[in-house]
């Protein structure tokens, strides 16, 4: 340690306090990294790692590895490190190096973590970036999230035996990028697995001392006010503990007042439809199962928003379907009004187009990280608001009129920004030249000196050329030497004695004169004074905007909601949706319903619509049979998606629909081995079914696909029947259930259990070919057509025919009729060729090489086989 320079000791002291972060240490115009941080940054960012030589006579700092990045390009590098799961501590020079006596003071100004990102380079425009606070202890669970880029904050709490299930559902809903946990939550292996493995969430464990009720309440009151703190439940302190610890963590890492974090949404269980992670995944609400892409999801269909705020809000609506009939009706009525008035809707959409991200722009302004360009972007967004107010005033609908009453046009703020800043200000606010001409007399005066000084420099250059005869003479400037006279080597003999040499170049020399230095002082002092004054004016403007943060956020919220409503209306018109009736009836009645995503993914194909009727008593459970690939899963998913769409206030893809409020949607679809946890497909299936039976209510909608597969036939059939009986029986669960199965024996339940109804997917056979009609019809299927589907999938004909023989034998042993199949042990008889095999033979025929006679003989042969 004795060998360290003062600067290196300063670095080590700061690094000691931030061991879990990569330290960006400001040195002039660069952020430097040393030691292990340098090795990590070099590897992750593809930076050149420089290592001082190993000479024992060299000081400590000369021996350690180092690398660096330009400070003005740091956002992109930070984004890459955050994406790889690192934390980055930003250490700045906290005093002017020119005024420093000795070592420049430095300190951590901010710690960037996955959940505390504000820079646009690190953020997805249409998605919130949440940091979560989680408290789990005994019977209580508390959950809170905050997106510091927008100020959006939510908090809730749970208690009782299902508290962890509810907590996991909320984690799936908000998908935080980072979570701070109390010891009880950190030691919960299932919770950690969900966070780290499934959600890819960065986890920070905080000590129990950070979760103290008095301190939490004080922090919440300071941040949101007394009224907000008073709304939090007193009988379950977990909400307050989770939120208080989260706010503490945000203040600790951000080193600033989060004044824009002033909107607290406390919500209770029962305000929104619950969807567990499995249901969200299977229904592909925001991303596809396989590619994890937006295209192919329900969000892809519905999202025609024009603003980043609207895109984030629409995603939130999909994640949080409503349970209040009146709240749904307000959205529904607004969408209906927009659908009805085409011209006004299109004008509104045009006014929304081009509005910048007011929420995140305001967040950066309050944060102190915004530049002049951010403020001009905010002003440009505000310029759209008066036109939106005017367009909204033309509507008669109640909710749209409420929105216009809430929309502050912010004309005064837009005028202040426009009067203060140039239309296209430079990137930096520290070097001047961004305040509008005429705004401040002193700025104008200093600029006159600056611009006049540049003219004087040009005149001096011309005079020196003429006086010395040096044609290549030029006067330049850099931050090291200031102004200088540069002369090429070919004219060195003409340099006057009054020139003082300062630097030798490859092709020439640089000089100064006393006259040039005197002029430099006058110009640079004016430049420094102008830059300082312009920055002072900028900070005043920033404070004006900070004082209006609530107004700006309120306007942004209205714009976002209006954008969502316009998006839903545009989609409804384009895709021919209907306005559903949403009530408390407990009935799901759909006429000619369609799958919203499938019909958009295949616009050239004709989608076959289907009816649905499910009541509280009759048709409570539908057993759906039919072959694979016929459309059972598509049908069940489309019912679930239409229910969800109706409960976010959207129109639905049908001719008519009536949707009784559904409190939860559960799905058990497809196979998903959890090999990392040592669980087989069947174990995962049974675990999911167990969760459904434990958490579902009579108001839930269950989508169950092929329960019981993965074990022996009789085991699977027994489990499937027992599950269906439990779901359909009103004395046990009585939930609305769509139950797809290949166990045709279960169709006998229609006559034995009230509320159970059989349906099947219609198919048409032609010989041994099968045509899927995609139509749901009453009654059970007589067979599964598995072998026909296998043939369509391309299995060799010998395998297909062997399967037919085995099926016939099995059905004979079971006492069931089987179609006649002629087969040999090793060779298939020619007379047993099906229509499909004739087609296969035609496909294999090399038509171009056949003579006319050979072709005719082949045709006779094939016709003979068919007969």
What are these regions (language model features)?
Residues 328-331, 351, 355, 453, ...:
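Intracellular alpha-helical coupling/juxtamembrane segments of multi-pass membrane proteins
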Residues 91, 114-123, 257, 393-399, ...:
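Active-site phosphate-binding and catalytic loops of NTP-dependent enzymes
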Residues 441-451, 455-459, 828-861:
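C-terminal accessory/binding modules appended to enzymatic or scaffolding proteins
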Residues 171, 176-184, 190-193, 205, ...:
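Conserved catalytic alpha/beta cores of large enzymes that bind or transform nucleotide phosphates
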Residues 208-221, 273-277, 285, 289, ...:
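Amphipathic heptad-repeat alpha-helical coiled-coil/stalk segments that mediate oligomerization
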Residues 1-337, 346, 353, 357-366, ...:
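Charged catalytic and DNA/RNA-contacting regions of genome-maintenance
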Residues 35-38, 236, 240, 306-307, ...:
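ATPase nucleotide-binding head domains, primarily ABC-like/P-loop NTPase cores
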